[in-house]
Design a protein with these regions (language model features):
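Histidine-anchored nucleotide/phosphate-binding helix
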Residues: 37-40, 142-153
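Short, well-ordered secondary-structure micro-motifs
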Residues: 61-62, 105-108, 144, 169-170
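Active-site rim beta-loop-alpha module in soluble metabolic enzymes
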Residues: 96-112, 130, 145
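Long, charged low-complexity segments
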Residues: 112-116, 149
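Active-site acidic carboxylates
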Residues: 1-100, 120, 125, 129, ...
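Glycine-rich anion-binding loop/nest that anchors nucleotide
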Residues: 128-144, 158-160
């Protein structure tokens, strides 16, 4: 890899970790490997982006309003905060998504930074051509972020040691990884294989 790479951390928030409103099994297990990637990318002077679900209290995304999911990651709540052990340390640009009351937003590319700039534009402004993606959940927001990244012309690497899935149906995560590969994403099995 070269200076055109960036790390994209997807939705490592309290509500997606054990004890959260929409917990992913072993969701907190992505934190330690992601912290290693954060240190590696920051040490190399490369960009880091962290997406987050940032829902209003009332949204058609939630079951109570006709959606699929229990209420989760409501902006301003502890459930919407990043996992306390994730060491972003002010080094990441925060990208918020799912802010509309009447729409689902799974992809990080649906999100914007504090100034309203979308992830694709942020990446392009930084000269990024390759994104390395990890986080939660493999079969929803990670998958959609990876697929959107490919559609937008980015090279994409999935950090397999740093993703976990919901698996509402058995095998959803495995099928999602297959879909990402079919779309042209590369898989990095473990941190030690990363070359910057």
């Amino acid at each position: 890899m070269d200076k055109k790479a960036a790390l994209v951390i997807v939705d490592v928030q309290n509500d997606f970790c054990p004890g959260g409103a929409l917990a992913v099994a072993e969701g907190d297990q992505v934190v330690a490997p992601l912290n290693r990637y954060i240190e590696r990318f920051a040490g190399a002077g490369l960009s880091i982006f962290a997406t987050r679900d940032w829902h209003p209290a009332k949204t058609t995304h939630f079951k109570a309003y006709g959606g699929q999911w229990p209420a989760h990651c409501v902006r301003g709540t502890s459930g919407a905060e990043f996992h306390r052990a994730l060491r972003l340390g002010g080094r990441a640009t925060i990208v918020s998504k799912g802010m509309a009351a009447d729409a689902d937003s799974y992809s990080g590319f649906d999100g914007v930074d504090a100034a309203g700039v979308g992830l694709a534009d942020l990446l392009r402004r930084a000269g990024v051509t390759r994104i390395c993606v990890g986080g939660l959940a493999t079969d929803y927001c990670v998958k959609e972020t990876v697929l959107d990244g490919r559609k937008r012309g980015f090279d994409v690497v999935v950090l397999k040691d740093s993703v976990r899935g919901v698996d509402l149906a058995p095998g959803d995560s495995a099928r999602s990884l297959e879909a990402m590969i079919a779309a042209g994403a590369d898989m990095l099995e473990r941190f030690d294989d990363l070359v910057l």
